[in-house]
From Swiss-Prot:
Species assigned in the record: Bradyrhizobium diazoefficiens (strain JCM 10833 / BCRC 13528 / IAM 13628 / NBRC 14792 / USDA 110)
Classification via InterPro entries: Flag_Lring
Keyword Membrane: yes
Protein name, entry field: Flagellar L-ring protein 2
Gene: flgH2
NCBIfam families named in the record: PRK12788.1
Length: 231
């Protein structure tokens, strides 16, 4: 009984291999390049050189009359169009069975100094193992929305890193949309928009915070138990 009391805490500690924080906050996105930071940094802006303006003139020499409106510099804004219609259905079944049997027999006859003895020995050994597994996934996603993102950095090859977020609050429910990734200037359309499937290392997160989200999630005590339970 004492050994059982000592073994139970050790078994519970084996469930601590994962990150317990995920049980409270949910899965976290992997970083893009330098990473998507939880705290918003100051938006980088390329300083613009001011040119002298002639007084009593309606023309400003610093005006970009023929400049392409597409985002190309740090601090520019580009609109990301997200139109996702994905369906996935997986059905996996695995089975394994093994049966082995060993039979051993021995007969002997012995006569020593007039004393006779004979006998028979038989030994049987058999094993049987069987494993079956079944898994099924049926998922359907339909998301259509757009979000404005800011160019946070321009890579040496000309590609740009973008990051954007939106927050919608309805009563006590907050909806948060985050998007980030790396885009090529050539993939940006003339209307300064880009489709999400042309974003490399795309990170799209859409979730909520509030009373409704709290009701849909299990309690924090249950989540902690699931994080440390070894079974």
């Amino acid at each position: 009984m004492k050994n059982l009391i000592l073994i139970l805490p050790l078994l519970m500690l084996t469930g601590c291999v994962g990150d317990p924080a995920d049980a409270l906050t949910g899965p976290r996105l992997s970083p893009v390049g330098s990473g998507l930071r939880t705290q918003a940094d100051p938006i980088p802006v390329t300083p613009r050189m001011r040119t002298p303006v002639s007084y009593r003139s309606t023309w400003d020499d610093g005006t970009d009359l023929y400049r392409d409106p597409r985002a190309r510099r740090t601090g520019d804004v580009v609109t990301v169009i997200i139109s996702m219609q994905d369906k996935a259905k997986l059905d996996n079944k695995t089975g394994r069975s093994r049966d082995s049997q060993i039979k051993f027999g021995l007969d002997w006859l012995m006569d020593v100094a007039g004393w006779a003895d004979k006998g028979q020995t038989t030994a049987n050994l058999s094993t049987n193992t069987q494993i079956k597994g079944n898994g099924q996934i049926d998922r359907t996603e339909d998301i259509k929305l757009s979000i404005a993102a800011i160019v946070t950095d321009v890579l040496p090859n000309g590609n740009m890193m973008i990051s954007g977020s939106q927050e919608f609050r309805v009563n006590t429910e907050m909806r948060v949309l985050n998007v980030g990734g790396i885009v090529r200037p050539r993939d940006i359309s003339r209307t300064n928009t880009i489709s999400y499937e042309k974003i490399a290392e795309a990170r799209v997160s859409y979730g909520g915070q509030g009373n409704l989200s709290d009701v849909q999630q299990p309690g924090w005590g249950h989540r902690i138990y699931d994080a440390v339970a070894p079974f």
